A protein has these predicted regions:
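Catalytic Walker B motif of ABC-type/P-loop ATPase nucleotide-binding domains
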Residues: 154-158
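The feature captures the beta-strand-to-loop junction immediately N-terminal to the Walker
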Residues: 34-36
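A short, proline-enriched helix->beta-strand linker immediately N-terminal to the Walker B motif
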Residues: 148-152
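Helix-to-loop junction immediately C-terminal to a conserved catalytic motif
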Residues: 49
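Conserved ABC ATPase "signature" region
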Residues: 97, 101, 108-125
Length: 243
């Protein structure tokens, strides 16, 4: 999916959480959005997913303007927030079945779903209500739903700090990379620069609601630019830090 974020701003009261963010994201890309707490990362994802409406600007998916009422467009994306929302009494199998209905997908391959749940250490928990699961188990359950649905746009808020165990993070990275190879667009937020540098095809840095960096990573890996990026993040977190 082609994603165009065109001068998007978002205001809460008197505070601008986002100020004129413009980005063009191509199909097949994994995009890491970095920034300190309060930089605007989650607000940007909320606007992209239709959870919040921009105060100004627009978001286009494949050239069509998006808003929360565009249900057909919303069926082409899926969003995993920092703490996935889940019906307390629902279990994992019911969640996957609900996702398939909402996204109008055919019945999945049972063996492939079972293998995925086994890799996520969720297979013994398929009948457990979400209210009894840990945060990491909830995030892995939501990840399983996204993998099975396979939307055109995958959006993750802080998957690397979601409480998932190392295997869960490994499955996230593997499935996100496989999705990108299928032409999906993957966007995730993080504060972990080292992983983002190695995993993302593009890195965007937000600070106080503004876009400070938009860098294609592929041709820059191993060129020494990594230190420049780390220095930039440190300066944004500590304005007194000198170059």
């Amino acid at each position: 999916m082609n994603v165009q974020i065109d001068k998007v701003s978002k205001k809460f009261g008197r505070v601008w959480a986002l100020e004129e963010i413009s980005l063009d994201l191509a199909p097949g890309q994994i995009v890491g959005v970095l920034g300190a707490n309060g930089a605007g990362k989650t607000t940007l994802l909320n606007c992209m997913a239709g959870v919040a409406a921009p105060s100004a600007g627009r978001i286009l998916y494949d050239g069509e303007r998006f808003h929360r009422g565009k249900m057909e467009l919303r069926k082409r994306l899926m969003y995993l927030p920092d703490f996935p929302l889940a019906f307390a009494k629902m279990n994992l199998l019911e969640h996957i079945a609900m996702c398939m209905r909402l996204y109008e997908r055919p019945d999945p391959d049972v063996e492939k779903v079972a293998a995925l749940l086994e890799q996520l250490s969720l297979l013994p928990l398929t009948g457990m209500p979400f209210s009894a699961m840990s945060r990491g188990q909830l995030y892995k359950s939501a990840l399983a739903g996204m993998v099975v649905v396979d939307p055109e746009l995958w959006i993750f808020d802080e998957p690397l700090a979601s409480g998932m165990d190392p295997m869960g993070i490994a499955v996230f990275k593997r499935e996100a990379r496989a999705a990108a190879r299928r032409g999906r667009t993957v966007v995730f937020t993080t504060q972990i620069l080292e992983i983002a540098e190695k995993f993302a095809d593009r890195i965007c840095v937000l600070d106080h609601g503004g876009l400070r960096l938009n860098r294609q990573m592929g041709e820059r890996r191993g060129t020494g630019d990594e230190g420049d990026l780390e220095d930039l993040l440190l300066r944004l977190r500590d304005p007194e830090e000198k170059a």
